[in-house]
Amino acid sequence: MTPAPVIIAVDGRSGAGKTTLAVELAARLRQHHKVSLFHLEDIYPGWNGLMPGIERYVGTVLKPLSTGQAAEWTSWDWEKHYDGGLNVTLPAEIVIVEGVGAAADAARPMLDAVVWVESPGDDRRRRALTRDGSTYEPYWDSWAAQEDEWLSTDEVIDAADIRVQNLADGSAPDDVLQALMYLPSVAAILSPELSARRGLQLRSERLAETPDAALLFDSLYGKSTNAVWLDSSNASAVAGRSQAAARSRFSILADDGGTFGQSALHRSGMTHVTAGSATVSTSGPFFRWLDSVWGRRAVRAPRGYDGQFTLGWLGYLGYELKRETGGNDVPSDTPDAALLFAGRAVVLDHREQTVWLLALDAPDAEEWFREARAAVKAATAPDSAALDAAVPGRPGTVPEFTSRDSATDYKRKIADSQHEISEGNSYEICLTTTLEASAGDLDPWASYLSLRRRNPAPFASYLRFGELVVASTSPERFLRILSDGGMRAEPIKGTRGRSSDASEDAALRHDLETSLKDRAENIMIVDLLRNDLSHFAIPGSVTVSRLCAIESYATVHQMVSTIDAHLRPGAPRAEALAAAFPAGSMTGAPKISTMDILDQLESGPRGIYSGAIGYFSLNAATDLAVVIRTLVVNPDGTGGRTLSLGVGGAITADSVADDEYEEIRTKAFGVLSTLGAAFPS
């Protein structure tokens, strides 16, 4: 008897392409492993034998193989319509079982991975009849009826670890193999395949061009289902080598296309990763999944490239991931995290006025370089028609927002917050609410372009994950971790609106700069973040390099501090991130007890608002912004779309309710005024 094998079931309806997929998957796995392959069609007892065949398969094939023993089974003679000879399937390091019912309920306890193969009904019928000819045609309907009956009682589709759309392009075997590597149950045995994927080579080109970023993004990724633009839209306003200029030096444009492209969505403990035609689902905490994929494929940065992003994951983390960092479990209307893996990207270096094209070496890399090079050239000297196409006019009908909390309700919650503070349950509570509207005919792309023009910011971003769109003009860095372990947080606490009158604007800035209340709020969050970073920092490395500085943006003045630290060598970076998440500037202090209070006070989940947007690079670097000043466009499940804009402010013992309410109106103004909308009365 040999050790128990890893058993992979390839299931799906007749004609879905299971046999071809299983054979080609086995061929790929045989490069590093001994593989046995079993086809259920060899054991079904006739055209009416689906359920008896599954029973035979489980009892005579799967049970012995699962314990490392040879399986002796009786085949079916399809021409003579009775049992054929005795056959033996030997155990191996990996066993693939394929056919309708391969992952049936009785089989699943003995399986390590379940792959469900999907294909449209017409394609399945054509494929099956092409394979089996006139022999199968009279039985197609009766066999399909047996499948229907089985699937009506067996939740095999929902139980699948991987679901694959078996396309005609032949991509399914490679996509499934890549998806299998995400499954803890088979990842260990696939270490040779994982090692091969980790030996990645980064190719690059440097172009001395200054393209129009919006036109370039639209040209390369305007039709991509998933795409991300991390947009330092205020770069022209902060030239030089100051901290503000450093934050605004790079913009990153990417999608999940190409050989290495993937996307990941996380909801309430389940992570779904799509690689081409295959989607793999794994249960467990998001930050544990992130730890398994972030910084595991070190690549060397190109010579002369100063950026920290060397390809990797980009997207957002939602506020409700706090369930993994000490907060309560609150369901969100949007995925708790959405990321794409960019195996190729365009990086704009605004300081050096250059463009970097980055791509992992792959068969399709050269073609992408040609396309990207041409797009950069076209966006550097665009004609008027190209600009008109990429930069549309009106965003759409002006939306009418409502608020989850009326002015009276919000002010009452301010009083409730101050009661919690007086009871000693918190020092500072970052109370928020959400403005909501029907999206109507609003164009998210046009809206974002208007937002970035009117409210340029170092951490602006445009994210598209299918129908979900995020348009952010955030000025606030949550957390940066450099590839060498340097950490930095830059919380914002304290806001004043700008004035068009220079003297009045200067007075507003001075008022913020000298406000004892705002300084107290800011210093409390600085202290919280010092603690958050210290959990994984080298002792003594946590410093405050800037305290309560004032930065001015298009519509607001902000009070900003900077906390620096250095990550302990070997410390898990995803855990260091989790220790600081969500941003203390969006919770208050102390963090965990204050999050509990906020769950009681606030009228619904925050969703993407208060979370983080940014990247997780292959070289283990990350740079994340706090999700504020951000418009979210989300499908409502009925064919429509909703808009949401989160706003809030820090409540302390000496907060004045009217002033706090005016502050959230000020924070909302930049986004609402761009849309032509008003703050709800």
Predicted feature residues:
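ATP-dependent NMP and nucleoside kinases share a basic, alpha-helical "lid"
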Residues: 85-132
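Conserved lysine of the Walker
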Residues: 18
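NTP-dependent small-molecule kinase module
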Residues: 1, 109, 113, 130, ...
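Hydrophobic positions on the alpha1 helix immediately C-terminal to the Walker A/P-loop
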Residues: 21
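Conserved nucleotide-sensing/catalytic segment adjacent to the nucleotide-binding pocket
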Residues: 36, 44-90, 94-95
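Extreme N-terminal, non-catalytic leader segments
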Residues: 1-8
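P-loop (Walker A) phosphate-binding loop of NTP-binding proteins
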Residues: 13
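Extended alpha-helical targeting/anchoring segments
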Residues: 185-681
